[in-house]
């Protein structure tokens, strides 16, 4: 199959490109490299640098790359805090970018898309673990735009026959077991990389944002899922659509929650380093608990996560950070 990916140079998604190529697929990459790294792009991909909001740029790729079977859509701004202070940026990039992509797909007869969604669509859940049928009431603008993108796919299917799979994944983390591919954001915003930067000394401390949540230790609880398992889920979703599967939404998580304090303690155990912790006030838009039920993905897609142990996940990330203290920078 020939697949196009929006934003394949960004950190947590490049493992999926490697897996697609290892499985014999041709992959076309479209990315503006705003937050990604050209060094992370697989050498066997066809890479185009461009802005998804520019219709002529995405049209040009579809014109040149005939025979694209499906699109895997990752391109989006994804920082919860920033989305609360700069919501218009998120509506412009996430919603407008997706609209332009869909317009071009419809014009070029490409009718299958796998979408990178998020647990943030649920907001403060009524229960855990969260089911795909549970209410979606986002508590931040990032989650709101992702929910709106899902609705866009729904209506475009009604009008134009587009089939889609939306993968609502929980906290992506970890690194490739080789230690060659890992997370490198600028600025860094993900919990585990920040903790490990504090452990290796490239960061002074780790901040805990909120210690008064209604949880066992007062800190937020999240479901952590390894990027390799996320990568496999996207491949299975493409195969599902290629075989005629109907549009659907799937949660991707391990079904177990860990508090911020628990993650820090596990990182201390893995790294054998002391990690300075600073307690701060809550950030806007952070739900107290997010834990997934992924039974549907396991049943329908045949998804089987390999990494269900937090210590193992952190070990893979620590291997990356230990050998790449400056990320992809030389």
Regions found by a protein language model. Give the residues of each.
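Single conserved hydrophobic/aromatic residue that forms the stacking wall/gate
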Residues: 1-9, 13
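Rossmann-fold cofactor-recognition segment
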Residues: 44-54
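Catalytic helix-loop patch of NAD(P)-dependent Rossmann-fold dehydrogenases
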Residues: 85-103, 107, 111-112, 121-171, ...
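Conserved mid-core alpha-helix of short-chain dehydrogenase/reductase
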Residues: 57, 100-104, 229-232
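Aromatic pocket-lining residues of Rossmann-like dinucleotide-binding sites
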Residues: 20
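Conserved glycine-rich Rossmann-like NAD(P)H-binding loop of the short-chain dehydrogenase/reductase
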Residues: 25-34
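C-terminal substrate-binding subdomain of Rossmann-fold SDR/epimerase-dehydratase oxidoreductases
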Residues: 11, 15, 194-330
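NAD(P)H-binding glycine-rich loop region in Rossmannoid oxidoreductase-like domains
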Residues: 52-93
């Amino acid at each position: 199959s020939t697949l196009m990916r929006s934003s394949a140079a960004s950190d947590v998604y490049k493992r999926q490109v490697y897996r697609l190529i290892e499985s014999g697929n041709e992959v076309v990459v479209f990315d503006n490299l705003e937050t990604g790294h050209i060094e992370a792009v697989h050498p066997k991909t066809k890479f185009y640098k461009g802005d998804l909001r520019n219709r002529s740029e995405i049209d040009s790729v579809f014109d040149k790359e005939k025979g694209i079977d499906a699109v895997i859509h990752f391109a989006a701004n994804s920082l919860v805090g920033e989305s609360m202070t700069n919501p218009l940026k998120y509506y412009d990039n996430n919603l407008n970018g997706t609209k332009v992509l869909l317009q071009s797909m419809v014009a070029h007869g490409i009718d299958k898309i796998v979408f990178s969604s998020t647990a943030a669509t649920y907001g403060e859940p009524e229960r855990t673990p969260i089911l795909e049928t549970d209410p979606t009431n986002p508590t931040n603008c990032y989650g709101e735009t992702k929910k709106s993108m899902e609705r866009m796919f729904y209506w475009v299917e009604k009008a134009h026959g587009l089939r889609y799979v939306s993968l609502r994944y929980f906290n992506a983390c970890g690194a490739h077991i080789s230690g060659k591919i890992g997370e490198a954001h600028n600025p860094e915003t993900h919990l585990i990389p920040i903790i490990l930067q504090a452990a290796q000394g490239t960061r002074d401390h780790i901040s805990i944002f909120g210690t008064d949540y209604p949880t066992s230790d007062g800190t937020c609880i999240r479901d952590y899922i390894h990027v390799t398992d996320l990568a496999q889920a996207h491949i299975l979703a493409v195969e599902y659509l290629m075989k005629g599967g109907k549009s659907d939404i799937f949660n991707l998580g391990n079904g177990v929650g860990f508090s911020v304090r628990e993650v820090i303690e596990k990182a201390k155990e893995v790294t054998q380093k002391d990690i300075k912790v600073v307690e701060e006030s809550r950030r806007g838009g952070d739900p107290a608990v997010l834990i997934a039920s992924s039974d549907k993905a396991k049943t329908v897609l045949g998804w089987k996560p390999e990494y269900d142990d937090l210590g193992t996940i952190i070990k893979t990330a620590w291997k990356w950070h230990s050998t790449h203290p400056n990320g992809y920078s030389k």
